[in-house]
From Swiss-Prot:
Gene source species: Drimys granadensis
Catalysed reaction equations from the record: a plastoquinone + NADH + (n+1) H(+)(in) = a plastoquinol + NAD(+) + n H(+)(out); a plastoquinone + NADPH + (n+1) H(+)(in) = a plastoquinol + NADP(+) + n H(+)(out)
Subunit structure, as described in the record: NDH is composed of at least 16 different subunits, 5 of which are encoded in the nucleus.
Gene Ontology biological process: photosynthesis, light reaction
PROSITE patterns given in the database record: COMPLEX1_49K
Protein name stated in the entry: NAD(P)H-quinone oxidoreductase subunit H, chloroplastic
Length: 393
């Protein structure tokens, strides 16, 4: 008896929502033909908190604690972009010392983000040990953050015109010690991981993105630089004082998951180079432009009234955002983090549009995983490096 040939049944499975400690609450609906991926649909929004709408009825200083919840592994960058936008809108000068402190904090935050990408990425592809190794450097980093800002993660350290506090006594020496120790740590990771045959089998020629394709998808950060495009906003936009340091843009031309790993590992070394130069050359002077904090009381005769001071809710003294629109961007660890700000001659922004790198980089995932094996999904997803706090906002 002959059995009639039937169309092979496809299997639809749910991957996720993943645990928040790994890639955040991302859900993937995957269509499989055996082990081969036919289709993949990411489901977003589980961590949506209305961050853009919240910004519209907060002053910039009131809004600063919220922004650290976007990319909660690299909070200095979300703070930097939040204060950079009104600074550029109001043409506010930042003292040289404050600019150096900002660069130091940003590069420390970049190293912390890449470390906490490396651990879960290796765990995704089956290597559990590096997940525990990266916590050594991470703990030292968070000790430095805690000494300077008072907080280990949600720092709330940047201010319009500078930073909240100067570096404490002895902090620079401790940070230089960390740089020396961290360099040996990066060399150790490269010895353990980069030439490991099992690791190479999992990542080489997996999730390849060409240079033109990366530009067409609007990718940024290590995703773009791993595809042969030498584009780094620290070199392109010349913000803060990055031009005063000697460092190179790290890039690879292969465009696969291995190339993205190599770019991030190399970026950690470059960040340490920038840190060492900034720490050794940091100038004296004020850490904040205090002129910004002056409040024009002549306009507001009610400012000293009893009702205003003791009864009604009063915002922190802040300046008006001019009736202009502006796009500001920084090179975050995951790519281009941007803010489109529209002022309305008010202390509140009229529109605060966030351009998160993770959200845009994630869009290419369904195309990358098609015709790959099921096990390759976690490799490719891990190599993209997403944090759902900034994806869902």
């Amino acid at each position: 008896m002959t059995v009639p040939a039937t169309k092979k049944d496809l299997m639809i499975i749910n991957m996720g929502p993943h645990h928040p400690s790994m890639h955040g609450v991302l859900r993937l609906i995957v269509t499989l033909d055996g082990e081969d991926v036919i289709d993949c649909e990411p489901i977003l929004g589980y961590l949506h908190r209305g961050m853009e709408k919240i910004a519209e009825n907060r002053t910039i200083i009131q809004y600063l604690p919220y922004v650290t919840r976007w990319d909660y592994l690299a909070t200095m960058f979300t703070e930097a972009i939040t204060v950079n936008a009104p600074e550029q809108l109001g043409n506010i000068q930042v003292p040289k010392r404050a600019s150096y402190i900002r660069v130091i904090m940003l590069e420390l935050s970049r190293i912390a983000s890449h470390l906490l990408w490396l651990g879960p990425f290796m765990a995704d592809i089956g290597a559990q040990t590096p997940f525990f190794y990266i916590f050594r450097e991470r703990e030292l980093l968070y000790d430095l953050f805690e000494a300077a800002t008072g907080m280990r993660m949600m720092h709330n350290y940047f201010r319009i015109g500078g930073v909240a506090a100067d570096l404490p006594h002895g902090w620079i020496d401790k940070c230089l010690d960390f740089c020396d120790y961290s360099l040996t740590g990066v060399v150790e990771y490269q010895k353990l991981i980069t030439r490991n045959p099992i690791f190479l089998e999992r990542v080489e020629e997996v999730g390849i993105i060409g240079g033109e394709e990366a530009i067409n998808w609007g990718l940024s950060g290590p995703m773009l630089r791993a595809s042969g495009i030498q584009w780094d906003l620290r070199k392109v936009d010349h913000y803060e004082c990055y031009d005063e340091f000697d460092w190179e843009v790290q890039w690879q031309k292969e465009g696969d998951s291995l190339a993205r790993y190599l770019v991030r590992i190399s970026e950690m070394t470059e960040s340490i180079k920038i840190l060492q130069q900034a720490l050794e050359g940091i100038p004296g002077g004020p850490y904040e432009n205090l002129e910004v904090r002056r409040f024009d009381r002549a306009k507001d005769s009610e400012w000293n009234d009893f009702e205003y001071r003791f009864i009604s809710k009063k915002p922190s003294p802040t300046f008006e955002l001019l009736k202009q629109e502006l796009y500001v961007r920084v090179e975050a660890p995951k790519g281009e983090l941007g803010i489109f700000l529209i002022g309305d001659n008010s202390v509140f922004p009229w529109r605060w549009k966030i351009r998160p790198p993770g959200f845009i980089n994630l869009q290419i995932l369904p195309q990358l995983v098609k015709r790959m094996k099921l096990a390759d999904i976690m490799t490719i997803l891990g190599s993209i490096d997403i944090i759902m706090g900034e994806v869902d906002r």
